[in-house]
Every structure is written in C-alpha cells, then in structure tokens.
UniProtKB/Swiss-Prot annotation:
Naturally occurring in which organism (per UniProt): Bacillus subtilis (strain 168)
Keywords: Lyase
UniProt KW Nuclease keyword: no
Catalytic activities: all-trans-heptaprenyl diphosphate = (R)-tetraprenyl-beta-curcumene + diphosphate
This protein's name: Tetraprenyl-beta-curcumene synthase
Enzyme class: lyase
Enzyme Commission numbers on file: 4.2.3.130
Primary gene name: ytpB
Family per record: Belongs to the large terpene synthase family.
InterPro entries the record matches: YtpB-like
C-alpha cells in the first residue's frame, strides 16, 4: 500500500481520490435528510451536513490508509461522522437538557460500532420521533461496513473505548448549564490516574474526536493488520492527536460559543499565553507518540495538517487576537503547517467562488 508522506502528494491524493467520494456520500445523506418528516429533526439533520462538511472532509483523509478499500472506508467515515454531527446539533439545540435523552441518542453511536447490535428507538426520551428511518440507516451503514472487515474483532474494543469517552462527553457537556463543569470534573477523576498530566477540560477535548476511530477502521482493511498495530494506533491517537484536534476546533469557535452560551474548553485557560503553551505541548507530544506507528510520516502530516487547516478558517482571520495566535502557532510548528495553512486558505476561497457562481446561476434561472 502506497501512502503519501509529503504535503503535495497528500493533497493531490486527497483532492483526486478522497474528496469526490466524500461528497458523493454526503449527497446521499443530504437527500435522505431532506425527506425526514419531523420538521425539527429535518432542520438539524440538514444543517449538520450543510455546516459541518468540513468534519467529513477531514475524517475522510484517513481513508487513504485503507488501500484498495477507500470507497467502503469513506462510506463508514461519512456515515459515522454524520451521526456525530447530527446528534451534536440535536443536543446543542435541545430544549429538554435531559441527560437520559442525550445518553439514548448516543447509544446509536455505540450500536453503529457493534456489528449485530439491534436497532433501538434512540428518540424515546424526546418529543420529536419521526426521522423517516434516517438515524437507523446511518447506524446500519456503519454496521454493514464493519461487518465486512476481516479484522473487525481486533479493533472493536478500541472503537468502543473511544466511543465511550465521546458519548460520556456529549452527555455531560449538554446538560443544564450549572451542572456541566461539575459533571465533567467528576468524570475526569475516573480516568485521571491513567492519563498523562492534563486538566479536565483537556481530557474532555481528547474525548471529543473521532479521528482515532477512523484511523483504526481504515487500517483494519489491510490483510496484514495485527492486534499490536491496533494498540499502537489507539495509543498514538489518544490522547494527544485527538486532543489537539478538538482544542483547535474550540479555539476557532470561542467567539461563536460565547454568543450562543455553549461550553468551550479553550475558555478555561487562564491566559492566551497558557493556552499557547499547552497547544504547543500537545503538538510536540502528538509527534512523540507517533514514533513507531506504520506510515509515521503520513500521521505527522495529519498532525501538521490539523494545525494548518483549522487555523486557516475564516473565523480566525476575522479576529485580530486569534490571527496573531494562529501565526505564532504556525511558525512554531514549521513549514509543513504553513503549507497546509496556505492550502486551506486557497481551498476556502475556491469554495466561496464556486458558491457565488452557483448562486448567480440559480438567480438567473429564477429570473
């Protein structure tokens, strides 16, 4: 299996081989989401695909590790990430703030990773019920792909472990506001002795990523995959790469989360300087934990790519202080991050131009 280990080669393969598959799958789920009967469930399902395409594109890159099974791997990644983004929307905009409801919704993610698990009524603790089979179809798609993987049993324990952290996080961070931090702090104490030194909000960030799951699934398509490789991937991605991923996500969303009253883990740092120090710590530790993993250079590119792609977001450019921090982080992490930063800015401009052209065409048709 040939895996790109240089930035230009990686981006060429991503644009040529991965993004078309990602958008093909997203189009399928977009059509299904538009057929949902319940108006609230439909609104959140369509919004999650429209507003969070970026998550699917990023996750899809790991399908490059699946060799000849890219189509199947992308199918899983998009279905699973779509569940994640959809449920996040439902919880973020929930009026119930009921932990039992959030726990039941996220049982779908654990079922999606458990081949043979029976489907449940994941909406049983909320008013909105009729999603026209949307969530069940997403779960079944994940199960079907995993069921076709010869080495599924080797990765299953790690998939469920990482998913367990994610689901616990989603429950605790969405409950009534005054309960969120105490619940997250208490949850952190359950695992603190097993973790490297970090704060509760950093552990929460480490729990909030799907990258480890995608990496495990992608590699497990390989005929020579082993249990030791599965363990190495888990240890390489959790906690540091996953933590860096989500801390960057929260970094660029700080202003938005403040306005909407959403929990933001980056806001718990005492100062911008402390936040910068810890982000740099996560960058270096992520690199350190990648030593000895198959295709080590590829994973280092992913690590640097996260920095470049997130920090090239328009939200960063629109905030003076954030822009200053972004430049400092890019400089500290080297030329590869700078490459991905420039590439990310260019890709976003291209997307805007495409959107403007399509909007003009639609306007002409209407006229």
């Amino acid at each position: 299996m040939t895996v790109p280990e240089h930035p230009f080669g990686l981006m060429a393969k991503v644009y040529r081989d991965i993004f078309p598959l990602v958008h093909q799958e997203l189009d399928i789920w977009k059509q299904k989401s538009e057929s949902i009967h319940n108006s609230e469930l439909k609104a959140q399902a369509t919004a999650s695909i429209r507003d969070k395409t970026f998550h699917c594109e990023g996750g899809g890159i790991l399908a490059l590790l699946s060799g000849s099974q890219k189509q199947k791997c992308v199918e899983f990644i998009i279905a699973y990430q779509t569940i994640s983004d959809y449920l996040d929307n439902l919880c973020d905009r929930s009026t119930s703030l009921d932990p039992q409801d959030f726990r039941m919704l996220h049982a779908s993610m654990q079922d999606a990773l458990t081949v043979g698990a029976e489907l449940q009524n994941y909406y049983q603790f909320r008013e909105e019920q009729d999603d026209s089979g949307y969530l069940h179809e997403l779960v079944k798609t994940c199960q079907r792909v995993l069921g076709s993987i010869e080495h599924y049993d080797m990765i299953k324990p790690y998939l469920l472990e990482l998913c367990g952290y994610y689901c616990d996080l989603q429950v605790h961070k969405h409950v009534i506001e005054h309960e969120r931090v105490p619940r997250l702090e208490k949850w952190f104490t359950q695992y603190e002795s097993e973790l490297p030194e970090m704060e509760w909000y950093e552990f929460s960030a480490c729990a909030g990523s799907t990258l480890g799951i995608f990496c495990l699934v992608a590699y497990s398509f390989q005929p020579d995959f082993t249990e030791s490789t599965a363990k190495k991937i888990r240890d390489s991605y959790f906690p540091y790469i996953q933590g860096l991923h989500i801390l960057l996500d929260y970094l660029i969303d700080q202003e938005e989360d403040l306005l909407e009253g959403d929990l933001n883990f980056c806001s718990y740092y005492q100062s911008h300087e402390e936040m910068m120090d810890r982000l740099e710590h996560f960058i270096h530790k992520a690199d350190e934990h990648l030593q000895g993993i198959p295709h080590e250079n590829f994973h280092r590119l992913i690590n640097r790519g996260l920095l470049g792609v997130y920090l090239s977001d328009d939200k960063v450019a629109g905030q003076k202080e954030m822009g200053r921090l972004a430049k400092k982080l890019i400089k500290a992490s080297g030329k590869t991050s700078l490459f991905f930063y420039i590439n990310g800015r260019a890709y976003r401009k291209f997307q805007k131009m495409s959107w403007m052209k399509n909007s003009k065409k639609k306007a002409q048709i209407i006229c």
